Amino acid sequence: MKPKDFMVTLQRKVAFGAVGPSAVRGQGKGVLRASQDFCSQIALARVPKSSAKRYQIWLNRQTEFLLEALPIKNRPWGAARKAINLFLRDALYNKYLSRQFKLRSVEAWLEIPLDSAVVKGLKSHDHRGELPRWPGLKNLTQDVSEVFQVFASKQATLKGIARVHLDMYLWLDNR
């Protein structure tokens, strides 16, 4: 039997581990802690599991909520989205959180957390010039992110994995 606060504490630990200093480096003072605190409080029980469209609407709202929580003027959409995607990926990978909140049911919809290393890996597979120039995390917009996510989905399908897992392959390829 686990104490009542076990899942809350575990979610906080996963949030702080997933969204580390290197994840949001250079995004502004206070962005790291605000992102960690926000992710530690995401209501994982409310993640929509009925459709990809509902999940995407939820994810967009969470990104907006995190942007509002950031303590800086120029709020970087890309950094907020990356933080949430990192957290959701690590929550999926955590046995307890994944089981408790049935996160495997949204595995196929989770986004790959975008950054320059992931984009470099994606671009190495872009033989048709489908991908735009990487604007950097600070200047990443939802529309540009979507182009990278669609391309990542195609690459993941070729590997027989969900898009969120492609991050591991691309990260290792860049080492």
Language-model regions, residue ranges each:
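C-terminal accessory module of base-excision DNA glycosylases/AP lyases that mediates lesion recognition
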Residues: 1-17, 21, 26, 72-81, ...
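Phosphate/adenylate-binding glycine loop and adjacent helical scaffold
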Residues: 1-74
